[in-house]
UniProtKB/Swiss-Prot annotation:
A Pfam family recorded for this sequence: Ribosomal_S3Ae
Domain of life: Archaea
Family (UniProt): Belongs to the eukaryotic ribosomal protein eS1 family.
Protein name (Swiss-Prot/TrEMBL): Small ribosomal subunit protein eS1
Species of provenance: Ignicoccus hospitalis (strain KIN4/I / DSM 18386 / JCM 14125)
Length: 212
């Protein structure tokens, strides 16, 4: 690399500022790191990958990846504020729950919250032993029933808590045990697909725009 190019790169980093990443209200507005930008507007729409452990300080949640998206920047305070984009459990963790001579039943469901957010939720239920196709079908039906009963009665923040801290998974397991012995249920993944607006639901896509 030429000296001129090295100098240009160095100058580019010199003008960048570091912004503190702040979680949304549902996670108590805690700081989860910093991100650089030479212009604040370029941060808008940037996705942040953190963990529930980083947010809560509880090591038992180190396997829960939380995806946030920057939607607002305070240039004076050097803070980047975020909204919830989705979550996903670490694949190694899911792999550790999958055992020989047992079954994994996965269901993917699109559902709306009470306050107008459209979500895609993936549920994994693990049985104690290998079960039959008819039992898998019945358990998947229970997954669907619980998701479609609980989520529309909650706000997005309530759904986030119910997904990440086990309330929805526990309800699915309790009902599914009437069909077959259940070892565990996890809300493996979620994604916000739509968000409310004055004109109605819009795709949950945030695009950075330079100031006029």
């Amino acid at each position: 690399m030429s000296a001129r190019r090295r100098g240009a790169l160095k100058d580019k980093w010199k003008i960048k500022k570091w912004y503190e990443i702040i979680t949304p209200d549902v996670f108590n507005n805690v700081s989860v790191g910093q991100t650089p930008a030479d212009e604040a507007w370029k941060l808008i729409g940037r996705t942040v990958d953190t963990t529930l452990y980083d947010i809560t300080g509880d090591f038992t949640y180190v396997h829960v990846h939380v995806y946030l998206q920057i939607n607002k920047v305070d240039e004076e305070a050097l803070k980047a504020y975020t909204i919830f984009k989705g979550h996903e459990l670490a694949r190694d963790y899911i792999r550790s729950l999958t055992r020989r001579k047992s079954s994994k039943i996965e269901g993917i469901f699109d559902v709306w919250t009470k306050d107008g957010y459209g979500l895609r939720i993936t549920v994994d239920t693990f049985t104690a032993y290998r079960c039959q196709t008819s039992q898998k079908r019945a358990i998947r039906k229970i997954q669907k029933e619980v998701i479609e009963e609980m989520v529309p009665q909650m706000t997005l923040d309530e759904v986030i808590n119910a997904m990440l801290f086990g309330d929805i998974a526990e309800e699915i397991s309790n009902r599914a045990r009437k069909i077959y012995p259940i070892r565990r249920t996890e809300i493996y993944k979620s994604k916000v697909l739509y968000m409310p607006s004055p004109e109605g639901p819009i795709k949950a896509v945030i695009v950075p725009k330079p100031p006029a």
